[in-house]
Amino acid sequence: MRKKPIGKLISHLYRRNQKILSKKLAPYGIGSGGQHSFLKLILQRPGITQEQLTNELKFDKATTARSVKQLEESGYIERKTDPNDRRSYLVSPTAKALEFAPVLQGILDELNVSLVHKLSEEEEDLIIDLLQKISIDPDE
């Protein structure tokens, strides 16, 4: 019998991770709710639509809209109406976001290291493989 359910352990790690991230990103005006995930994807794919953000990050539309609005108000992104679909917005990073990108990546890398610092390289590879294996959605 397991000491603790796997879901509970994953939830605990997620909450701890989010708490640390929120604290590290707050000075830059980036809040919780996955804003860093949205910004990272927008930096990787300038001109992505809000719908694509929703689908790729697997957030609901309301969370996407709220995060995009907050990132826009903080000056990290800009939204423009999609010329091919007037009901859709294209989201791109601003100069502020491009300048912040290495800082964001550094924070995320540092956090990742802190999560696995007690593991050997083999254990880290194994846990990544196992988490990816159980996170695959059978409906996709």
Please annotate each region the language model reported:
Residues 21-31, 113-119:
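Short amphipathic alpha-helical boundary/capping segments
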Residues 14, 40-44, 132:
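Short, locally clustered residues in the helix-turn-helix/winged-helix DNA-binding domain
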Residues 35, 46-90:
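Canonical helix-turn-helix DNA-binding module
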Residues 69-129:
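Charged, amphipathic alpha-helical coiled-coil/dimerization segments
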Residues 1-28:
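N-terminal leader segment of winged-helix/HTH proteins
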